[in-house]
A protein has these predicted regions:
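N-terminal "arm"/small-domain region of PLP-dependent enzymes with the aminotransferase-like
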Residues: 1-58
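Short glycine-rich anion-binding loops that position phosphate/pyrophosphate groups of nucleotides
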Residues: 26-32, 134-139, 169, 194
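Conserved core of the PLP fold type I
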Residues: 41-156, 163, 168-187, 233
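PLP-dependent enzyme catalytic core of the Aspartate aminotransferase-like
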Residues: 144-146, 288, 298-327
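A general structural detector for well-ordered alpha-helical segments in enzyme core domains, enriched
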Residues: 147-151, 177, 257, 282, ...
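PLP-dependent aminotransferase class I/II
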Residues: 185-265
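Conserved PLP-binding catalytic core of the aspartate aminotransferase-like
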Residues: 260-289, 295-298, 307, 311
Length: 327
């Protein structure tokens, strides 16, 4: 299994203490106040709710996308399944980015290349599938929608796919190309867990042409998304007041975090990453102060930090960073 953020229990076991600050993920730390599901949401088999899909279409600014949107148990479910829907192919994955993409395309017999963002344009010419994380996790790198659609046109002309992972796209809606996902060969992944702070819900969406969604749905099987998850997501996707207030708060907090970090830091309102020269030492320094950050050891060698929740947590983070810089 690949390494991810979280795993706070392991940190506590290793370093001791209980008053930890978990900044190791890019998940909104002040998530949506989930309502209690109705009793029958627990009792009945969870058939897909058309109202949830309509709410998602409205939220993503694509009201005509209804036949082209499939709820799934988190974007991870789609990431694991999509490579099984193609014969062995030449696959280029943006790098560094969310490692599960490369892992699963490689695992299912495809010829994999990990391609820096600056080289993606050239990679499209001799690839059957191109996977782009936009905005990128962990670096925050972005690709303009017009460029993505141009790449899709090249790939689709020869039966290829463009897979765009927009899991962190809620804070940058202008980057989304989900509204175009009725086009054959374009697949867009959206997450409810990140912006809404509902990672435990395990709910996301795949936007794609109807025939491909039918294949994906068949592969994932019936009752892929629980009834309680559908009810909570329906409320969250329709709560415009909460969404607007959260966008403003995340923008403010993201700028505050960025101001604390080195000049080379980049990211999104939910997290920032930088190519720390001594990432293991930094990670250890923070852990000794009961602050859990994300250490990247390989292609994205560096550190990613998410947002603190409370002012006291901000103060602890600032103090720990000041000690590191003075050391």
């Amino acid at each position: 299994m690949l390494e991810h953020g979280g795993k706070l229990r392991e940190a506590m076991q290793r370093y001791g203490g209980s008053d930890w600050i978990d900044l190791s993920t890019g998940i909104n730390p002040l998530g949506y106040p989930a309502p209690a599901p109705r009793p029958d949401a627990w009792q009945r088999l969870p058939e897909p709710d058309p109202a949830l899909v309509r709410a998602a279409c409205d939220y993503y600014g694509a009201p005509d996308l209804f036949p082209h949107l499939l709820p799934v148990a988190g974007t991870q479910a789609a990431i694991q399944a999509l490579p099984r829907l193609r014969a062995p192919a030449r696959v280029s994955v943006s790098a560094p980015s969310y490692a599960e993409h490369a892992h699963h395309w490689s695992r299912h017999g495809h010829t994999l290349r990990q391609v820096p963002y600056a080289a993606l344009d050239a990679a499209v010419r001799d690839s059957d599938v191109v996977v782009v994380v936009n905005p990128n996790n962990p670096t925050g790198a972005t690709v303009a929608p017009d460029q993505l659609l141009a790449w899709h046109a090249q790939l689709a002309a020869r039966g290829g796919w463009l897979v765009v992972d927009e899991a962190f796209g809620d804070t940058a809606p202008a980057l989304s190309i989900a509204a175009h996902a009725d086009r054959p060969g374009l697949i867009v992944l959206r997450s409810v867990g990140k912006f809404f702070g509902l990672a435990g819900l395990r709910l996301g969406f795949v936007a794609a042409c109807a025939p491909l969604l039918a294949q994906l749905e068949d592969l994932l099987g019936p009752w892929a998304v629980s009834g309680p998850a559908q009810e909570v997501a329906l409320a969250a996707l329709g709560d415009r007041d909460w969404q607007q207030a959260t966008q403003a708060r995340l923008k403010h907090d993201g700028e505050r975090l960025r101001a604390l970090l080195p000049a080379g830091a980049s990211g999104t309102p939910l997290f920032h990453w930088w190519p720390e020269a001594r990432p293991k030492a930094f990670h250890e320094h923070m852990a000794q102060r009961a602050i859990w950050v994300r250490l990247f050891r390989d292609a994205a060698r560096g550190i990613r930090i998410g947002l603190p929740v409370h002012e006291a947590h901000w103060q602890r983070l600032e103090h720990a960073l000041r000690e590191w810089n003075q050391g």
